[in-house]
Structures are given as structure tokens and as C-alpha cells.
């Protein structure tokens, strides 16, 4: 996990945490388990946390590692040691159906060694997810990515890419644009957003290993696009009307015409919305969605994101 990286250690240090790297050696002094842990002061002692770890090359030493970590924490005056393991508890498909049984081995081992299990959580506790959606990217290229989506994902991707949205990689000075989106989202969904200086520190620490992306919309360009697309539909409708005048009993042509007329009607509504937004926001570009990606050798992490509910019909997060 990126959370066990040197960059994350540097970021946590910038944020005022006491960062430590701990490990366990086998009988030949080979490091078989290692982890980043971080501490902060609490009343009467220290709080210590191991998040998304440890990094393991030999699982047979896991119990000894956690026993040693527990003893080390006691020696350092830690009052609360929190472990958030990276091991998978259970795997589900995209519909939420389990693909296997719960793996309770780690929980049983930790509780046997005086740790208390807090149970499975939902939502966004402390601003971080405990449920992860994982997609295997092996063999997938930029050209084949969309074809790997679900049927719904393909439809939404096609729609999102038809609106003329612009994707921009932000500089550090532009991060307030990112913060404005994530803050609006956190207020709407009732969780605590990170402060702006956290995102700035992350930008500095991860450098090219992080992308802060913004999806923006130019309403004037969007309105022109709607006019152009509607004109094409009207020409198709005119041809269908002409075909039906020759063969009025053609069920196929009749169905096609009804579908095209329905699309034209939806374009009229979209144009009205666009004109209302122009009156409200003017003709400058509007930021409607934001996302932060972290890159490591093992994974690409879609870490933080947000979008404006008013523009949800553009499906900007998908692109």
C-alpha cells in the first residue's frame, strides 16, 4: 500500500506525527516483516497506529511481529495501539455478493494477543475508507480500458465523453480548486475533509507520484455542442419522416423516429439548463469534479475525490 511508502512517512512527519519504521528479523537476521507506524501525543501518553500494513515476506512470523509490536508500544509509553491491517478480510463482486468466506485468521490471532476487535465499519470513518474496490489492470491498455467496464460503466463513459469536459492536472498553486470540490462533497455527505495544507504537503511529498485532476465544463462550448448534436438528430428525424411517407407501415422506422424525437426533446431540456447555468455562473469554465490519484509500482490508488451535485448529470468522475 502507498501508506507504507517512504513518501507517506515524509508526509506524516510534515503533519506533525512521530514516524517510525519497525520490523521483525528471522534467526538469520533477515527482515521478514516491516512496517511504518506513526505516533501522536494523547493525554497521559502516546497513540500509535499501523495503517495498511505490515509489509510481509513470510506470514509465519506475523504473530511474533504483532507480539513484538505490542511489547514495543508498551515500552514506549503508548496508551493506545491501533492496527489497521492490509490483509483482505473477504472479497465481493461488483454487486456485493461474496466470492469467498471471511478470513478470520488474523482477527483471531490479534485478539488472542490482547488486541480488541472493533468490528466491520461502514461509511467514511476518520476520512478514510475501510472497504476497497479493486480492479486488476494487468493486460489492460488505454485502448481497451473502456471495454473492460461493466455494461453500465460503458454507457456512462460514453455519455461523459460526449459533453466536451476538460481534464486538467493541477499545479500546487491551483489546489484550492481541488479543495473547493472536496469540501463541498464532504459537507454534502457528512464526513470530514482534509485541510488545504494537507493536500499541499501531499503534492510536495509525492511529486510526480500523485495527480490532482479537475474536470471542468465551459458552458458556452457545451451549449454550442448541444446545438450541433441536436441539428444532426433533426436531420435524421427528417429522413425518417420522409421514409415513413413512402412506407408508413414500417414499424422499424416508426420506432427509430420515436427514439430520435425523444432524444431531441431531452436536448431541448439540456439547452434550457445550459442557458440557466450561463445566467447563473457566466461563461467561464466551471470545475465540476476532482480526483486525486497516487501511483506506486504495485497499484494506482483513487484516493480522494468529489463532485458538484448540481452537475451530476455529466458523470464527470468517470473520466
Region spans (language model):
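Acyl-donor binding region in acyl/amide transferases
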Residues: 45-128, 262, 283, 288, ...
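A conserved beta-strand-loop-helix scaffold within acyl/acetyltransferase catalytic domains
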Residues: 1-44, 90, 115-126, 134-313
